[in-house]
Structures are given as structure tokens and as C-alpha cells.
């Protein structure tokens, strides 16, 4: 069913002021396409070229028309031009170059007609019959210094928007941060607050500068006749007096200081400072800071510190009367009536702000506990307090303690805790005044250990007394920001305790309002209610979602005060919430899921009834995405409801919440108490939904909060869809009333609480996952990276064998041997002799990261050395001829064959599991395939099965001593890798057990970019079907070479397993261990196998610890990648635990057979397994899987 935007509107009556502009007449508009050769990505350059064209040919070839140009491809004129297509040539002088002969550049401009556009659609739109999008711009004006090398550009924002009275010009003051156009030396001095520039920069300072200047454009000034521009990509780790580079093809090398003196006769003053680097790491350009100047007009997009935020807010934070006056002055200054483009297109702008009617909604009556002196409360101007009031449901805190990382004295911390406890008890909570352990201070440099120590001591003490666990940890933060995210992550992710963070500047001098807010937060964290709204409305409030895919939903009725939140990871900058409803495939049935479905189930469990109406407050949607978001998310809501019960489709109201807009409302008369609050802003509850709103769609502006400083910004609520058929009064009153039950403070908030809570959930998830900071009132508002090591460090990626790649933070002086030692310790692997690969080459272990010129996220591969040693050992490991090993396989349960790195370029799918008797046949097929690959890639030497050996300690095959394999890696030739080989083997593996049609279906299910060389597999499949197949995989070499040219375009690795059923087609090496464990959970087996899965020994096999790639700290555990070691260890530990009286050897072995049969489809369900008992047992037994799975 198609969705249409809601078309209802409301009506209001009290005066509020806005800004209006009208269009006097409607003209015929002609659109032309512009192409400029040579092309330029800069709009400014394109505009200069076109302005030059208008100067030269405006009155002649252009017929006196003044065209409007967008700086790209489109040009508009008010009326026709004398031509339909014309080419012009103009010459433009580059003002940056002083040699005008070289600076003059010729441009060819082609203008051709694209179509005629009249303004009939605009008329229809303004009459409410058509929908369109506004055009917006931001104009910059005055500037102001905000510190640390940055400046604030103050200007104004303007957008032409449709309203019920015609076109409206919306103007507002705007400000943003830019780099100051100063020399890089000056920027560094301000940014680092350096006084003595003769001293060299520390590594800590160098890292800070690199982060601040990366991507910034600079221009050089050491050549008088030429100015060149570069983009900064990094900073050199050593000073330019020591930085040596080749200056010619003869190998001549000089330092940067020497080069500038010899080439430009320029003596560098800051020789102890590093150079800026431009270009790539392979071809760097070194630029001394003192000859570089930051190009003007570059926006600073990184996070500002507290001081800079304060300075930039001062530029725009103005009282309503001052802001209105400033906007009016801007309108007069811009002289819209004299604008030549406005005159050309017949637009007239009124200079006066226009009065529009509005109304003020009454605040709701709030309900508190009957035990308090005041049982109800009527907010005054959007605010109230907790004096003589008790929370509706006061929480209980019996076990708590406090930990301080600040410089507050112990007696100050104890006094704050006492005041907070007194406030909690006074407002209706039950708070034990005695902590579990004494309040203490701790070293801020060791936050994680301090938290773990407090948790350990309190848990031990409470366990002895039988009092449960720690219920609340009060934490006094550092004076400097940066610790909040780490504390939340450790407390909630690792330790599982509730924490309340407080800023030392508030805790040292707490006032009653602050203590009330903290008490309310603690009560909410104990899942209790602080107050209720006495409402006559029946629809339950539903959830909201922020741009980071956090969704919250109300869980009580009819109070609507308790909310539950869910967070879902999704694509970067994805505005649609992808996980509202999901469908999973199970071998037995279809499994429905998603956040909306979970909320509906939780609501029913909590209240005993299903939701009869849903109100969806949706945040984080831009206007251009309204239709797309509505269609996708309404469909998800309907599917989630229908999945619970057939025919269950509650009516939904879909409301988009927007705070980031530039509409401001001013009182009609400034200073009147009946029209303004204390800050001079409009009264809380002011709502506007006429005249300045959309001519057809249902939306309104609501200012639900009282202003604190500056001019209040009303929240824009856009009703996209309304099946509940709300009137404007009903939805506006409901939204306003909800703003009074935000659980963390005693005043009305500016945004409806579900939207607020979704932002909190999203930011909290970032804190717990990445250690980011939060903007809470009792916690810090920002966080900066802290460089812990004075020595320069670099994050690299290391892969050992086939374990998962892990990030390691190493010093630049670290050698390859240091990398090996740390990586092996991380994986708990012991290897005696290894190769270290950097890129595609083996490196010496003595080489350092600095000498290798490694950059961030460089990848290193550590593999056992497979050649050398005596005849019966390789790399210290015992080896036996592969033919002898094949003969010894017999009827063994399974065998693991590992593909050595010599045979795989990419390292994908590097080993196979081979079960039972087919092992010999499969290895023979492997050798046949290697012959095909040999022919395709032109090995330096041929080999046979006699050249291969088996290493029982590693469970892998390798080439014996003296066999050398070389790949042809020329780019112009297509090269097969062992990912292809392993995939082909797996195809043959399945082919031997299934129908050929299933194999072909699995291959052709691949989508572009999902697999590699599908044509090669097709060739192989055709060859499998050929009559010669009985003698092995003797491929048609001519046919193969004939199709080789088509294979060169394939780039990704072949992966035939991603789109297949995990229960049936799970292949070792093609998916992670986590999916395997999930598959185990789906297998219907007796419950006794879980004991082994949860044992400490098994957990060491299942998981490995990994480090945070940003902080380098131990962050948690992750499933191991499948490796030969973990598989063998898994089987050994599994059988060991099964034999501890839980099952017989026969059952344990059979269960292992069942598990492996779900990984590699080797056996049918009723196939009889062969069980090989220990030596002490006399005879073998045979049994079927059904016997083991029989519950009886």
C-alpha cells in the first residue's frame, strides 16, 4: 500500500514574530547545461570563469541576460538566449602566480539549452497542490579568534522555503570554526601554547599537530615568483636537520636543511622541528613549517575543546531582542530589493519581519508520591523543584561506595556523598548512609585497575556477608575530560555494575538543584519512576531513533515514564534504521526479529496487553530522506506487528523530530512578563502551526522549554503519517506534556523525551564500545586522546597462522622480532622458526618499523618456516612423506590438511578438513588441481606427490627440502590463488556427496563482487562432467587458456560459502568461529554437551583477548578464527570432558562426528559411523547417529 504524507493542519491565535518574503511574478525560466574545459572541481574557479564570460559577452552573445549559475553544470536565465548551443573561449589569470605569461589559462565554455521551466509548478506548490524542496545557503561575514590557531566566522544562514503565505526567506545568525590563515609556525605556537620555539617538539606534540593538520591545504612562500599549494598528509618523525632524501636519479642524498640552502639559498631557522609531509609514503614531499602558510577559508571539522566552544557560543548566543535586531540589520545590509538576480527573476523581498499568530499550551499537572507534603505540582514557566515532594517509586540502594580520581580532599568527597545521600532520602529513595568500603581516592593514571580493585574488594566483602552485589558506584571524575568513556566501559561492559559519574567542579560545591538532578538520575538507574503526568490522553507514547540507530520505547501504561532502549550497529551515515524488523532463515522455519518486534513483546509482558496505538517520534532524518525513511520504516513496523499475530496492525503516527533548523520565534513585545520568560524568550509551550508552516503538510514548531541563555530554538515536529487521526491540538498537547516527564531533571526539556533517551542510548553505546565521552549534566562533555608513551608509536595489523588479524601498537624502533614475540604471546602460540611477511616479501627480523617505513595499519603475516633443516624435519617439526601418511589414514575420524603459504598468495581458506576413507582420493585430486594451477601460473619447477611431506605436529602438508615454488605476479596476467584452489576443492568435495545440480546452483547464486573467478569454476565443472573425469581432474588446458583473458577482471577472493546454508555448507576457513558456535546451538543434541563448551579449558580455545585499536588497551574477548591448533585442541578437550562420567567414549566420539558433520557435509544422517575404541577395548562398535540422538 503506498504511503502519502499527512495533510492535516492546526490553528492558533497568539502573536509571535517570524520573517516573510513573497514572489511578485512568475517568469519563464530556461535551463542550460554548462561544460568547462579543462574541468575544475572548484565551484569558485567555475564561477570566476563564467563571470569573465558574462563580462566579455553579457551584452552581446547573452542578449543582456544575467544568468544564475550553480558553480557546476546548471545555468538559468529569465527568458531565452539568442542561441540554443554556443561555444566560448575566455582567458583567466591565476592571481596566485606572479608570472602572468605562465599564469594565464584558457578555458573553453560550451552552453547548450537543456529545457524550459516555467513557474507553474511553483504556483501549484504554493497553493498546496505540489511538494518541493527549499534551497539553502550560508553566508560568512565577521571573524573572531577562538584560540589555538582557530577563528570563528560569523555570518548568516538563509533559505527560501514554502509557506502558507507564499515563499518565505528564513534568515538566522550562524557561526562555525575555521583555520586561521597564518603561517604553520604561528599555528603550532598557538595550538601548543609554545613560548620557546628554539626547542625541538616532543613526540606528544608532534602527534597532536599531525592530527590537527592532516588534510589541511597549505601554500609555500619561499619562492617569490611562484606559489604552490599542497595538502598535508603527515609529519615526519625526525627533525629536518636529520631528514635525508634522494635529490636526483644518481643517488645523491641531502638533508632538508642542506637542500633548501643549495636550491633556494634559504636558511631554515627551525631545523630541530619536523617537516610537514605531502603526497604518499612512497613519494613524499617534505615541506618545512616555516615556509608554509595555511590557505584561507578551510573549515575546522574536528571536535572543539571547552574553551573554543565557549568562545564560539559567544558569537551567536544573543538575547532574543538583540538577535532579532541583528537579523533585521542583516536584511537591510544585504539590500535584497537592489539585488540584480532578484530583479532579473522578478523577486521582491520585504525588509520587515512579519507577525504570525501562535498559542501557548498550558503545562500538565505532575503527580508525586502521597507521602510527600506536595502530592501534585503545577510547573511554573517550564520549571519546578523537589522541595516537599517524594518520587512516585523511590529506589533502594543498600550496597554502594565512592571512588574519586580528582584532586578533591577526602573530607570533601565524604561531605559530597553525605549531601547526596541526604537528598536521595529526602526525595523518596531508601539510601544506606554507610558505604560497603570506605570512600577513597585513586591514581587517575590507573583507572581500570582501580575500578577492578574496588569491585573485587566489595564483591568479596558482600559475598561473605551474603548481601548480594555492589548496587552503585559513585565516581568523581578527573578535572580534565577524557575518563568518562573508559569508566563506563569498564563498569558496565566488564564488571556489570551501575555507576554515577560526577564532575569535581560540581561535587566540590554542590547546590540543591545539582543534588536533585543526580538523585533523579540514580533513581532512574534503579528502574524507578520520579513523577507522573496527570493526562486525559489514551494513546501510549512510542519510540524514537537517533541517527546512530538507537531506539527506545515506553514500557508502562498509562504513565508512559519507563522506557527501554536498544542499539543496533549499521552502515556509516545511514539514515534508515536497518534493524527495525529482520527475518532470519532457520533450517526448520523462518525466524522473525528486530527492535520493534522486541519492544512489542516486552510491552505485552510488562503490561499484559498489546499496544493499541503506536506513536513513532523519529529523530535524525533530513528533509531529502523523508519519503525513503517513511516507506522503509513504516513497512518494518507493519511487518513487526503482523509477525506477532495475524491481523494485528495497530494505527501508527509517524512524527519526525528536528532540532537542527534555523527558524526562530520572537515575542511580539520584548520584556512583557505575560509573553516572555526570565531570559526574554517566548513562553514554554508556545506552538506555531500556521502561516510560516508548509502549505499542505502537517507540522508545527513547539518551544516546550524555558530559555536559559541566548535565543530558544523551537523543535520542529513533522507528521509524515497519521493513522490515529490526531487533531493538531491533541498531538501538540501530548508532545508538550511528554516534555515534562524527562526523568533526569525538574524542568521541561526542548525535545520530546523518547528522542532524548534515544540520543542518550546511542552516546552511551559509543562510550561502552569506543570509550567516547558523554554530554551528561553530571559528566564531562568532551574527551581528548591522551598519548601515554613518550616514544613515537604506530598501530599495525598482525596475522599469525590463520588466527584473526589483531591490531598491535608498537614503537617505531620495534623490530620484526619484537612483533613476533608480542603477536605469539597474544595468541598463546609457540613457534620456533618463522617467516615474517610484510606485504608480499619476507623481511629480516632485525628490521625496525622505522626502517621499513611502515605506516598505520600496515599488515604483517607470521608463518612457520617450511623449508630447511635435515631430511626428517622442517623448521624443527617432524615430517613424513605424504604418500606414507595417506596410506596410514585408513578409517580415521577426520584429518586436517593445511595449505602452506607457499601455495597461497592471499591466505584465504588455508586448510581443509578431510574425513574418513575419501582422504586419499581427495589428496590425489588436489595434486591434479595443482597441475592445472602449475600450467596457468608457470611455476619455476614442476613437482609431484613425492615432493610433498606431512607435518603431524602441525597437521599440515609442505614441500620437502629443495623444492622451490615461484609465482608469476605480473599485474597484466591473471593469477589464481589458493583461495581459488580451496574453493574448487570444496566444490569437488560437495560434488562427491551431492548432485551436480546443487553444486551449479551454489556457484551461480554468487553476485558480482561476492566471488572470484566464477568462469574458472564453470570451466572446472564442465570438466568434472566430461568422460575423462574418472581418471581425475584432467582439465581441458586449451579451453582454460582460451578463457584466461576473461578471468583478469576478477579481483575479489572466491567464497562459495557466504550465501550457503550454514548448517549444511559450513566450511572450515570460510567463516568465523562465532558462526560455528552459533551453529552448534542450532543442533538438537542432548544438553550434556554444554558442560564441556562452558569449561575454562574450552573457553581458552574458543576465545582470545584483543586490544582496542585506538587506545591499545585490552578491550575484551572475541571468537578465535579457526586454526589447526584450535580444532585439534577442541576435539581433545571435548572428548575429555565427555568422558567425565557424563557419557561413554562411544557417545563422545559420535557426538563429535555429529558436530563435524554439520561443518563439512560428508555423511548422511543414517550413515553408520566407525568407532575406533582405546587400545584397552577389545572390539570395535558400530552405531548410527539416531541412536545417539534418541532421548531415551
Curated annotation (Swiss-Prot):
GO MF term list: RNA binding; RNA endonuclease activity
Residues of the PAZ domain: 183-296
Assigned GO CC terms: cytoplasm; nucleus
Gene Ontology biological process terms in this record: regulatory ncRNA-mediated gene silencing
SMART domains reported in the protein's UniProt record: DUF1785 (SM01163), PAZ (SM00949), Piwi (SM00950)
Gene3D superfamilies attached to this UniProt entry: 3.40.50.2300, paz domain, Ribonuclease H-like superfamily/Ribonuclease H
InterPro entries according to UniProt: ArgoL1, ArgoL2, Argonaute_Mid_dom, Argonaute_N, PAZ_dom, PAZ_dom_sf, Piwi, Piwi_ago-like
Transmembrane domains' residue ranges: none
Stretches assigned to the Piwi domain: 472-770
Keyword set, alphabetical order: RNA-mediated gene silencing
Family to which this protein belongs: Belongs to the argonaute family. Ago subfamily.
Protein role: Probably involved in the RNA silencing pathway. May bind to short RNAs such as microRNAs (miRNAs) or short interfering RNAs (siRNAs), and represses the translation of mRNAs which are complementary to them.
Protein name (database record): Protein argonaute 13
Organism in which the protein naturally occurs: Oryza sativa subsp. japonica
